[in-house]
């Protein structure tokens, strides 16, 4: 192979269709657009989604909002105020809260929220803490551990 004998692949260089150059050319007169109708007029084609004047599908269906998060993480939530009734020095986990009856069903990992007051020192192990809950547990002399 040399530069002087390079050639394009067969069928790679397709000729442009010359329309409106007489009937013998094959694309004369109506230029392949047929006889009459909207598709043969100038300014064609119609815009995408046009249904001939009928109310289009994208306007017939309602505007949907508030799609749920696909991979949303659900937590079993407990407020700090609910932990105030436990004895000082208690190890708080999801299992221990279910045993005591503070949590009735397991909805996922434990998350501690900051509503309520806490005066006893507790050792809390949970998957997540709000900033307020963390401050209240540590202010009461307790400790937190992320699981």
UniProtKB/Swiss-Prot annotation:
Cellular component per GO?
cytosolic large ribosomal subunit
Q: Does the keyword RNA-binding apply?
A: yes
UniProt keyword annotations, A-Z = Ribonucleoprotein, Ribosomal protein, RNA-binding, rRNA-binding
Q: Give me the ranges of the annotated region Disordered.
A: 1-55
Query: Residue ranges under compositional bias (Gly residues)?
Result: 23-35
Q: Which residues cross the membrane?
A: none
Superkingdom per UniProt: Bacteria
Q: What InterPro entries does the record point to?
A: Ribosomal_uL15 (IPR030878), Ribosomal_uL15/eL18 (IPR021131), Ribosomal_uL15/eL18_sf (IPR036227), Ribosomal_uL15_bac-type (IPR005749), Ribosomal_uL15_CS (IPR001196)
Q: Name one GO biological process term.
A: translation
Under Gene Ontology molecular function, one entry of this record is:
structural constituent of ribosome
> Where, if anywhere, are coiled coils annotated?
none
Query: Record keywords: rRNA-binding included?
Result: yes
Which SUPFAM superfamilies does the record associate with it?
Ribosomal proteins L15p and L18e (SSF52080)
* Assigned protein family: Belongs to the universal ribosomal protein uL15 family.
Q: What does the protein in this record do? A: Binds to the 23S rRNA.
| Quaternary data | Part of the 50S ribosomal subunit.
What name does UniProt use for this protein?
A: Large ribosomal subunit protein uL15
Source organism per UniProt: Synechococcus elongatus (strain ATCC 33912 / PCC 7942 / FACHB-805)
